[in-house]
Amino acid sequence: MNLPNKLTLTRILLVPVFMIFASLTGLSGIADGSFQPTYYLIAGIVFAAASFTDFLDGHLARKWNMVTDFGKFADPLADKLLTTVAFIYMMRDGVCSPVVLCIILAREFAVSGLRMVAAGAKDGKVIAANMWGKVKTVLQMITIIFYYFTVALTGNVLGQTCASIAYWLCWLVAVVTAVSGIKYLWDNRSFINTAK
């Protein structure tokens, strides 16, 4: 297994680490004084590190000519797992609307389903992420990192204000996610039309 693929697997392995620290405190703790900013900060650092591997694995794969079918399939899957889990915790905190999460999940299930159809087609095509998909992923990661770092660093002072900004960023994420999903399905509609 080459280094870019190892970085992709590392991103997947960092998901449960992020979950542990994100589970240890909640935004509701700001009101009753039980909020633990350190846990949010660690969760943010873990998420940022995992997000960096997304940039690094793609960069190295292209630079060293190590692009593989496994990487094309596993890299966006790792992104989906990482960001979706983070948005679930943000929904718990009341920062991410359930509607936003439903849009994200619907897009990811639809795209993943199409990828499986394409992989199982006669020519066995592996569909890589398009530009809209990459923009969507970057915006999702920026929103999540913004939320965890700003809330952790401002805590009781500006925590709720930062959370409100993150709330509207989540809606922007929903719009871009929906557009990227529609574009992806449209560009690969031949697999839908020929699916039996």
Tell me what each language-model feature is:
Residues M1-K196:
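Alpha-helical transmembrane bundles and membrane-interface segments of multipass inner-membrane proteins
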